[in-house]
Amino acid sequence: MAWRNRRGALRAILSGSHCTRPASVYDPISMRIADDLGFEVGMFGGSVASLAILGDPDIALITLTELAEQVRRMSRAAALPVLVDADHGYGNALNVRRTVQELEAAGAAGLTIEDTLLPQAFGETQPQLISLAEGQGKINAALDARGDPSLVIIGRTGALAITSLDDAIERAQAYQAAGVDALFFTGVKTRPQLDAIAAATTLPIVLGGPSEAITDWDYLAERRVRIAVQGHAPIAAATRAVFETLQAVRNGAAPKQLSGLAAAELMQRVTRGDVVDERCDHFLGLKRS
């Protein structure tokens, strides 16, 4: 697979002048839908990965192997660049190296490495951060492990919601100095916070869950925010649709009584049925009806 074009597309977003909303994607079908609808980039969040792969909440139970396998399936299904939430890199700095290598091979356009202490330690009721020195070590390891220089590596900090704005800026500046391609912040709620972050750094910014108070897209673009992640509604919508459909079937509804189902034309489109038909005809001499 030629992943470099996708990585170049993500880099173009980060070096551009506007703020884009990524599609929250989690499997091959959601990747294809997002690609068909014209999204510029997909975001494969950690919480979504846990739901899609394990059916569990986001408590750091997923393994690197499971994540990489899903990213590979998604990357093969559509040409959409996908930015992968690689959580804490699945261990220490040496584990981070392996994480980068596996996700790069799986076709990720980019990935984020964060400084949250994961999994949550015994007896801790609130999220904690690793030390700045350990965070720098992880970022250095990630950059060193990158085989394709076009792979986007983003340093992520959760300090704003856990410690302070000053700490978030200090960590971001350290990751910037290490050589990351962009900075990812969670917990940004106000314009003064974002103004301070933008003034103290020079790299493109990715925001996770920005508050409504700052989601003016022109303002975000002026502050170098190039990607703003606004939750993961698609998997929640899909879960409700499956629940309601199965509930109706369990209550005795006949197939013709079910509503909200994808039309045959849509199913043909998202499964790339026309491509499969052509290949069956060409290689097997079969006509699929």
Swiss-Prot record:
Keywords, comma-separated and alphabetical: Decarboxylase, Lyase, Magnesium, Metal-binding
Gene Ontology molecular function, alphabetical: magnesium ion binding; methylisocitrate lyase activity; oxaloacetate decarboxylase activity
Cofactor or coenzyme needed: Mg(2+)
Pfam assignment, any one: PEP_mutase
Residues involved in substrate binding: 47, 156, 232
GO BP terms, alphabetized: oxaloacetate metabolic process; propionate catabolic process, 2-methylcitrate cycle; pyruvate biosynthetic process
Annotated catalysed reactions: oxaloacetate + H(+) = pyruvate + CO2
Record's cofactor remark: Binds 1 Mg(2+) ion per subunit.
Entries under SUPFAM superfamilies matching the protein: Phosphoenolpyruvate/pyruvate domain
Binding-site list for Mg(2+): 85
Domain of life: Bacteria
InterPro entries in the record: ICL/PEPM (IPR039556), Oxaloacetate_deCOase_bac (IPR023687), Pyrv/PenolPyrv_kinase-like_dom (IPR015813), Pyrv_kinase-like_dom_sf (IPR040442)
Family stated for the protein in its record: Belongs to the isocitrate lyase/PEP mutase superfamily. Oxaloacetate decarboxylase family.
SUBUNIT field: Homotetramer; dimer of dimers.
Descriptive protein name: Oxaloacetate decarboxylase
Protein source organism: Rhodopseudomonas palustris (strain BisA53)
